Amino acid sequence: SDYYNNTVGVILTCAILYDFLFRSSISFNMLFLEEIWSRNFTNLFVAPLKVSEIITALTFTALLRSLIGIVPAIILMNPFFGVSLLKMGPPLFLLFLSLYLFGTTLGLLVTSGLLRFGPAFENVAWSSLFILAPLGCVYYPMSILPEWLQMLAKGLPLVYIFEEARSILVN
């Protein structure tokens, strides 16, 4: 089977894609958590910035931090493992875009939870993607999950993103 011939490539690619998702979500959260830790809420909300401007700044800063972390991994993947993520072609951009939108949306939901529940919600900020990873079928097809978990997994965009990544790599 092509899947087993490309096992290293499939696992590495999914690991890189998941790392990008994790970085985009946690970068969004970290920027807001730093405001909580430094007790800088007063300065943040007194500044003449609209909420949309704060969200836009968090979004672009999270993208920049994600790219700084992921580009070296993509570059080093080929010389060390003989796998090139760039061979996926144009669909790679759409996969990264989908993961970034999901990560940023999750980051926005966690940030709203931090605003509502305070620092006690910090555990959710760190664990949200680790909780979703088994249901997101990052490293394996959805068919491996029990039927009742498949029903839950079908509600997550992650399943379809990683299934498509595996499909592109195998075919």
Regions found by a protein language model. Give the residues of each.
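Hydrophobic alpha-helical transmembrane segments of membrane proteins
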Residues: 2-34, 95-112, 132, 144, ...
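Hydrophobic alpha-helical transmembrane segments of multi-pass membrane transport proteins
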Residues: 8-78
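Transmembrane helical bundles of ABC transporter permease domains
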Residues: 32, 44-45, 139, 143-146, ...
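Transmembrane alpha-helical segments of integral membrane proteins
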Residues: 160-171
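Short helix-capping/hinge motifs at transmembrane helix termini and TM-loop junctions
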Residues: 2, 22, 77-85, 115-119, ...
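Transmembrane helix segments
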Residues: 114-155, 159
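Short helix-loop-helix connector
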Residues: 36, 45-49, 114, 118, ...
